[in-house]
A protein has these predicted regions:
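Hydrophobic, Leu/Ile/Phe/Ala-enriched alpha-helical segments that form helix-helix packing faces
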Residues: 142-145, 219, 223, 286
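Short, well-ordered strand-loop elements centered on a beta-strand within folded domains, enriched
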Residues: 166-171, 248-251, 262-268, 291-303
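Generic recognition of cysteine residues
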Residues: 31-34, 234, 283
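Extended, non-transmembrane interaction/recognition domains
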Residues: 2-201
Length: 306
């Protein structure tokens, strides 16, 4: 099964239109269905990305302060006496577990605030530097280290301060209740379903910094229908039907457009019949206007028109 992620309409193509709406929102014009003004951000200021939370010591002096104030021994941290040793420690795969143990203490909050917080993407590459906006957000970062130690991902919601630097608004464990049905089928040992879920989820390997990527990531972790319906198409075909061998998921694309004063992204899944080559498409729609995306349409037939 071949999956392909394409962007039919980029946010840049809509920039002039987007800025025009933004000008209205700055004047406090409210949307028709809410009490607060619509908030749109130019230049893709919002982030909705999946990855792992890690942290590093920015200086040797902070590492020594951590060593002295925590119950960890020098042997646990490794002998760090110079910048080379510090770099070695920062690359240590066991560091998140050690930091979780030490930074969980309220006495070490001042050290936690000085740490260099990082989001690694799902492929393990350093993607963003993170800035907690409050004591609560710092607590979330520390707690997220426990997920990293178990190789469990988080969803980061935030806004860009500058290139590569993100202010943290919220951290959400990626094992969401919305995927409970999916998880139960995975536990059943269904190899075909497991492979399908892994393939679709692999599309979360993006930076989550465009409306298209934010919508895609939201759907992947908040809409179980994507997996359940795709499995039906691919593996629950009707023997007497036109495609007894089922369908293949051949393409996933995102179309973002302005609907009134709201930005709506349609995440479209294209299926092709193995026997006939006939195609059909289904979509999930997400409102990506504000910092927190939300689902508008769970699963509906997509009919393309020109």
């Amino acid at each position: 099964m071949n999956s392909l992620f394409t962007r039919d309409v980029t946010d840049e193509n809509n920039l002039a239109q987007k800025l025009a709406v933004l000008a209205k929102t700055k004047q406090g014009k409210a949307c028709g269905s809410c009490d607060e003004p619509v908030q749109l951000s130019p230049n893709h200021a919002y982030i909705y990305v999946v990855g792992f939370i890690t942290a590093q010591f920015p200086s040797l002096s902070l590492e020594k302060a951590f060593e002295q104030s925590s119950s960890l021994t020098e042997s646990q941290l490794g002998k760090v006496n110079d910048e080379v040793g510090l770099q070695r420690l920062n690359r240590n795969k066991q560091l998140p577990a050690l930091l979780l143990q030490g930074l969980s203490s309220a006495n070490n909050r001042n050290i936690a605030r000085e740490m260099h917080w990082i989001l690694d993407n799902v492929e393990g590459n350093e993607t963003y530097t993170l800035v907690p906006s409050s004591h609560e957000k710092l607590t979330q970062l520390i707690a997220a280290l426990s997920l990293t130690t178990k190789q469990e991902k988080v969803i980061l919601v935030g806004s860009r301060l500058e290139s590569g630097v993100i202010e943290v608004s919220h951290l959400i464990p990626a094992n969401l209740k919305a995927l409970t049905d999916v998880a139960s089928l995975l536990k059943s040992g269904n190899k075909e379903f497991t492979e399908l879920v892994d393939e679709i989820l692999s599309m979360n390997a993006n930076d989550g910094n465009t409306d298209n990527d934010r919508a895609l990531n939201f759907v992947l972790y908040h809409n179980a229908e994507v997996y359940l319906k795709s499995y039906d198409f691919c593996y629950k075909s009707t023997p007497g039907g036109p495609n007894p061998s089922g369908y293949q998921l051949v393409n996933v694309r995102v179309r973002t457009s302005l609907s009134g004063e709201r930005w709506v992204a349609k995440v479209i899944f294209d299926y092709q019949g193995i026997n006939t080559g006939a195609k059909q498409s289904w979509y999930s729609a997400v409102d990506v206007t504000g910092e927190y995306p939300f689902l508008l349409v769970k699963w509906q037939r997509f009919l393309s028109h020109t």
